[in-house]
Amino acid sequence: MDSSKVLKLYAELKENAVNNLDIVFYLIDIEKALDELKPRHKFVLTKICIEGYTQSEVAAMLGITKSTINGVYHNALTHFERNFNYDGK
């Protein structure tokens, strides 16, 4: 599963995770993977994938170019993928 889709799914699941233990554990795994990221990477993924900001908006927040944020975003996704190991079980 694409990491950006996982993070968007995280935002949706978090709102709906009332009584489903599997979803709760899935959310915990995602949160752990996010917590293992560098603060800047976590900030960028949270803003773009979970909160819905555009790369341009996040670039403006950080005072960097859109080109730079694109690199940071893809680097953050790569690190997230390494931290988050969902095997579909």
Residue spans for each PLM region:
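DNA-recognition helix of helix-turn-helix
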Residues: 61-85
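Short helix-coil-helix linker/hinge
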Residues: 34-41
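A short pre-motif secondary-structure segment
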Residues: 44-45
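Residue-level signal for the short linker/turn that defines the boundary of a DNA-recognition helix
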Residues: 39, 52-53
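Short amphipathic helical patch at the helix-1/turn junction of helix-turn-helix
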Residues: 48-50
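Short alpha-helical "recognition helix" segments of helix-turn-helix
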Residues: 57-59
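N-terminal interaction/assembly modules
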Residues: 1-27, 31-32
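Short, glycine/acidic-rich hinge or "gate" loops at secondary-structure transitions
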Residues: 87-89
